[in-house]
Amino acid sequence: MSRFSKILFTASLISLFLCMTALAGNWEKDDKGWRYLENGSPVYNCWKTDTNGDYFWLGPDGYMVIGAYVDDGRYVDSTGRMVKNRWVQINGKWHYFEQSGREIQGTKKQISGLWYYFDYDGTMVTGWYNDGNNWVYCDENAGGHMLVSCWKKLEPAQDMTIDKNAFDENDGTYWFYFQNTGYVTRATDSDFKDYAIGGVHYAFDQNGIMQTGWVKISDTQPVIAGYRFYNNDKSLGTFGAAHVGWLSAYPPSEISSTGDVQWYYFDNKGVPAYGTRVPSNDGTYALEANFKKITKNNVTYTYLFTEQGNPVYGLVQVRKTDGSFTSMYFGTKNQSCLQKATNIIEGDGTQWLYGFNNQGYGITGASNGYLYYKGKAQRAVDDKLSYYTVNGNTYLVNNAGYIIKNYNKSKAPGTVEYKSDAAGMKDGGTAATSVLLQPEYQEQE
């Protein structure tokens, strides 16, 4: 028996007993029912009270009416009493009558701390209801009150347009969240909207259906910046919540890639890390030196991300905050974090000597006996010695990249001469300066 049924049954028993004892004085009962006499004659079409102050309606035949609407929408129950401040089930539908006996119609009403909606005929609304501003849901299984501040998995309203193909698994029900106003949480000015609920971010479409997987929240550049990933499996965390931390997944279909699974990193609001690509001074491109430091097991690692939102690996060209360009090394694809190795594998597969400063930036200039350009050691390639000009200074280096100081010898009688001073800079030699050896950068997948 439902809450309302128990109330109705109990009230009927009590009222029946009271009716038999309280109707006295001018009240008279015969085989047809109760009448009220004034000066010995019955009254018609009016209200009269008993000794308890309860109101009863006398119909056109003078007899007390029971279980019916009377007098401009008021209702009398099975004992004849006017219903006030309580629920009544009429023809299988629930109705509520106020202190005045008036029925609640065409509005919402807070009753015992809970909100209810009523149709214009006074019937309590159950299921989905649109009040002209937004959708609410009145849960018949919870007494018919409007849901507030809670999740509910439901079939959508008939007026909602659902793209069932957008869901990998669909049993006809979807998750909705109802705010403290009772309104369903939904996107209003875009296809999808991200909302924080209890400090956790979720995405909803224009119907209010919770989304999972990749969801495009906004149009922005780079494209990945407008996406979030909402957990589509409980193994990833709270189902439907914006993913936080590392994630291995296929990229959004809008983003061109090799089609392989990629790594992504999301902050505590679900925003993916991404990089900014800029033209470089050598006709190629570089990434802005905007790093992401991530701590794991008390160790902090430095990452740089592509415009597609993937951590870079290998040798990468970056633009520093001062506008200059240089190289950085982020290890193997399995590492994909800043490394300070010296003998590294370049993008073309060649092993080469590199030099990096304490921040991981490739050195340009002389350092520790070697000459570097964007971190790459400059060395003689076609000869044992070569001149290279870096930062306006021309140095003499051997085929190991080491700066040769105080050198003053001819290669052979009558051939080109190499000569350097105490700093290893060119000092009168006649050999031509070689073209700088450029780093071979890793192409990011």
Stretch-by-stretch model annotation:
Residues 2-445:
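Extracellular adhesion/carbohydrate-binding repeat motifs centered on closely spaced tryptophans
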